[in-house]
Amino acid sequence: MIKNNSVVVVDIDGTIAKVGERLKYLKTTPPDYDKFYASCFEDEPIIEMVDLVKRLQSFYKIVFCTGRREQVRDVTETWLCKNGLFGDLLMRPNKDHRHDTKVKPEQLSNSGVLLQEIAFVLEDRDSMVKKWRSLGLRCLQVDYADF
């Protein structure tokens, strides 16, 4: 059993990885997620955030909770490892097109992590920050993203 306040939940895109040019694919109607995820392995790390998570790894269990699809799990795991980041990786099913505000809390619940075990969440996306906070979690917004 994990003790209370021993888990840090970390988003990936925009929080520890620079999304960059591929963000344009989410601004189309409908969003083109295939193209968006196709080049995620090229993302540059956000150095300050990667360094922070590396330090947190010594004190907390890290759970990466991302909106990325399972189809890019290998690439995502390689990217995390290359940047010295380790922890559980929660990803959405390939055909799940629901908004992150629905998917991410569900992923976390399905993983067995209890809300009281979470010390805080690192997130960039405004809608997710609001969602995490509505669940009673402390959420540190590391950047402002509205997509």
Map each language-model feature to its residues.
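Glycine-rich phosphate-binding loop signature in dinucleotide/nucleotide-binding domains
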Residues: 2-3, 59, 111-118
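Alpha-helical substrate-recognition element adjacent to the catalytic core
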Residues: 2-98
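Residue-level signal for functionally critical sites in structured catalytic/ligand-binding pockets
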Residues: 16, 68, 81, 104, ...
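Low-complexity, flexible helical/coil segments
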Residues: 44-48, 97-103, 120-129
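Surface-exposed amphipathic alpha-helices with a cationic face
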Residues: 53-57, 112, 133
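Short, aromatic/basic amphipathic alpha-helical patches
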Residues: 76-83, 106-111, 131-136
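Donor nucleotide-activated moiety binding/catalytic core segment of transferases
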Residues: 99-115
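Acidic, Mg2+-coordinating phosphoryl-transfer loop and its flanking beta/alpha structural elements
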Residues: 108, 116-147
